[in-house]
Each structure stands twice: as structure tokens, then as C-alpha cells.
Amino acid sequence: MSTSNFLPDHNPVMMLQTPFHSRVAAACEMNEWGAWQGYTTPNCYTNVEMEYFAIRSNTGVFDLTPMTKYRVTGPDAEAYLDRLLTRNIAKLGVNRVAYMVMCNDAGDLVEDGTVFRIGEQDFRLCTQERVLDWMSWSAVGFDVDIVDETADVAALAIQGPTSCRILRNMGFE
């Protein structure tokens, strides 16, 4: 492909593919693709209406690799997240996940997503937007490390009313 048709200041960039891309591409009957956080992702697989009702009555699997993932560790990780999130992190058990909302000091919504408790002082936050600068600024006074793991951690969401049964049948508890 010749790049002579691009504007002089245009910098063509290859879109990233998730580790699940080959399976996703095989399932993408509509062949309608878009961009999400620099990754090539399907806009839908078969039919938007069918997909909506499938996840409400059965199970849907989604490639969430493009979502932003932060690892928060250190002696003050729980205290830091207890300040940052509108959820009592002390009540979140190890190997559990919960919905979370991040708010600034004025109580304004910054971002929402999920928080995974990997260990006593080891957490992963999964968000749509990139908020590392704000999280780092909010960590002043806390002994924590915050690392953007987005490029290193792939993710699948398995959702719907039959998802637990399917996972149990696969050997997961």
C-alpha cells in the first residue's frame, strides 16, 4: 500500500489486536469493526438485538482487553482505595470483584468500573477511561504503587443469568 495518498502530517498507526482476536474474528458474522482504545474490536457479532436478548436470557462473552487496567499495591493500598472509591474496600474479600465508582474530593464522578481484590494489599481496577494521572495525584501521602497493566493483561467478561452454571460446568467454582 502506498502512503502517498496520506496527508503530509498524517501518521498511519496499526490497530492493536487482542490475544482473542482470531476467535473474535471467527465469531464476527457481521464483519463490522471499530476502534476501542487503539484495538480493533467488533461493533457487533451477529445482530445487536439478538445479542442484547442473549445476554439477558443466557450468556454472553465479551473481549474486554482494551479496557484500562491498573494494579494498586503497597502497605496502604486498601486505605488508599477506601478513600478513592465509594465502596468499603475492607468488605471486599480476596479473589472477589465488585463494581466501583471513583469520585474526586468534591464528590464528582471521575470514573466507574470494577475492583478486584487479588490479595490483602493487592488490587486491580478495570476502567473505561485512563485516569492514571488523577490516581497518582490522589495517592499523595499513601504508600502505594500504581501500575498501568493494560497492555499486559487480557480480559474476558462472561455475563448473563446462565454464566455461573456454564463456568461451573467448565470446572470453575
Where are these regions (language model features)?
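Acidic, low-complexity central loop/insert segments
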Residues: 111-173
